[in-house]
Amino acid sequence: MSDQPADKSANKPDLAAMRRDYTLAALDESAVARDPFTQFECWLDEAINGGCAEPNAMSLATVDGSGAAARPSARIVLLKGVEAGGEAGGLVFFTNYESRKGRELAANPHAALLFYWIEMEREVRIEGRVEKIDAAESDAYYATRPVKARLGAWASPQSQAISSREWLERRMMDADARYGASPPRPPEWGGYRLIPASFEFWQGRADRLHDRIAYARGAQAWMIRRLAP
């Protein structure tokens, strides 16, 4: 019997061969809404009603500064509001202002969002400037969260290194003992609004000839164009 370890590579999936064809729908610039917020809300509704898993989940990309030395980072957050129309219309999410993303947004307020609805063979990319929402708006949303989630906002010094899971659980118990069923909103926790400068709607198509329709904010109206896949 050989003493050589078994070759596990034979059981590994062939990543280079993994692919799927996209055939569910098409996207034409003559048929999209003139306002990208309208188009986005239409697709979001279809993702919700179409059974997509966590349709409001989005990747948020930020950078820690500007210039060649800036480093990007990304994570999944949840969309909690769409404020359509006007110069200040935007997409709202909540987090800890002292987390890595919060610190990066303080250093550079430009960010990108990505929604990927694989069940619909669709993707939406949104880029723009991020600002904090009013404290009253953050208070109102925070009050709707489950009590444990509100206590967790007090317990977790998000993005900081901690000694153990037990340390975090003790912090949770301390927050529960202090605030009980009525924890106030921590001052370092609240909402942001991304004000879009551009949208891109991607619809998967056969043979990798995907449809890409981009919107860019103009002086008077949104400009619409098709991009090569």
Predicted features, each with a name:
Residues 1-229:
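Binding-site signature for planar aromatic cofactors or substrates
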